[in-house]
Amino acid sequence: GFRNPTSGAINLGRSGGRIAHVDNASAITQNPANLMDLKRPEVTVSFNPVYISVEHQNASGATAETENAWKFLPAAYASMPILDDKYVIGLGITSPYGLSNEWKNAGGFADTANQGSLRYTTPHFSELQTILVNPTVAFDVSEKVSMGLGLDIQWSQLTFKQHVFPNGRFVAESDGIGAGANR
């Protein structure tokens, strides 16, 4: 799928098991109430490399493989206690979804006539890009209970490229902005 792995080395090391308790500014996107555990301003920046390589072999033995296997997933989070530590405000900027898949112009995806058994059946390029901006605020409801609220503003762009019979090419692009919330 296009869901990106969890952000940051610490959270990756925890195998994504970070929703219940996060002890850094990346709590902004999953559990902003945890920001109340942070007693000083904090900035967390990550630039996670991801390697995705796919090889396909059909029933007749023809093969195809992807190119541009390295992807880079940036994320940045900042939080700061305010008003005598009664509130913590935060801002997260991440890419929660978005990877691409591009098949080499050879084998099953060759764009030469009468080659490429997959040429007309599936996109040879697909890409989903997203940017999530997530301002948050956290506060204590009682001595033992904290609450956090966040606004999710997400931009996305989707692109597909596919060969069309007999020698054409179809490109579809779409983008949009959505809003939501997290707590």
Task: Give residue spans per PLM region.
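N-terminal, post-signal peptide beta-strand-biased segments of exported outer-membrane/organellar beta-barrel
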Residues: 1-97
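Transmembrane beta-barrel outer-membrane domains
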Residues: 23, 65-73, 124-130, 178-183
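Residue-level signature of outer-membrane beta-barrel architecture
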Residues: 36, 80-82, 139-140, 151-153
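Membrane-spanning beta-strand positions in outer-membrane beta-barrel proteins
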Residues: 42-44, 86-88, 136, 140, ...
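Transmembrane beta-barrel architecture of outer-membrane proteins
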Residues: 49-51, 72, 129-133, 153-155, ...
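Outer-membrane beta-barrel translocator domains and adjoining extracellular loop/strand segments
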Residues: 54-61, 101-110, 116, 154, ...
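Extracellular loop and loop/strand-boundary signature of outer-membrane beta-barrel proteins
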Residues: 59-64, 118-123, 170-182
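Well-ordered mid-protein domain cores that form the structural environment of catalytic cofactors
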Residues: 92-133
